[in-house]
Amino acid sequence: RGDKYRRSNGSFMTRDEFNHHLSNMLSGLFSLGGQPDHILIEYCVQFDPIFDNVSYKGVPDIRIIVFLGYPVMGMIRLPTRLSDGKANLHQGAIGVGIDIPTGTTRRGVFGNEPVKEHPDTEHSIVGLKIPRWDELLLIAARAYELSGLGYVGVDIVLDKDKGPLILELNARPGLAIQIANGNGLLNRLQRIQALEAAGTLASDPEARVAYAKAHFATT
């Protein structure tokens, strides 16, 4: 707006502050090991209006854990005032477990506490149907061939105009998704490992999604 830039939390920074931030990025302030870095300018996501009542300022994202091509667990991360509009659980966002077969949210975690409502909007975060869920699962399953990673967290955002967009592929996704779902990953991973041992892993992403929907419900 004018000579100012709007942050994801709604606040503004001046052009000088913006230039200083870019300089910090290039100098490696935010990179692993403090090495000089590059800047990638991305499209500004306009998140789907279904999330209006359960998100504070920023863009919610959906993480799906994929093991050997099978989507085994999912959650949506909802920004809060505490997280400053960022969908980051370690900074105070809410993690909400998603039932793989139906794409419906089941339970949430805020810090270490179970929650059923967003702390800022006071709207329920339980029973929310994620739009285009089957498409999201298929995108996640295909990320296996795309990345070559046996275990990967696929982070997806839902844009109101462009639909599902991959935000990033995370080779070391955190384990808080288990708390958000009230289920551990081990049994699900072992089930896929059994398929691998039997030589029956599916090569078709659609078949892998169908298997996940049949076996990985979050109650």
Annotate each PLM feature.
Residues V154-I156:
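Hydrophobic residue at the +6 position relative to the catalytic HRD Asp in the kinase catalytic loop
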Residues R6-V109:
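Phosphate-binding site of ATP-dependent enzymes
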Residues I64, A143-V152:
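Extended, basic/helix-rich recognition subdomains
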Residues V96-I125, L136, A140:
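Intrinsically disordered, low-complexity Ser/Thr/Pro/Gly-rich regulatory segments
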Residues R1-K4, S8, A140, N170:
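Conserved N-proximal alpha/beta basic substrate-recognition cap immediately N-terminal to
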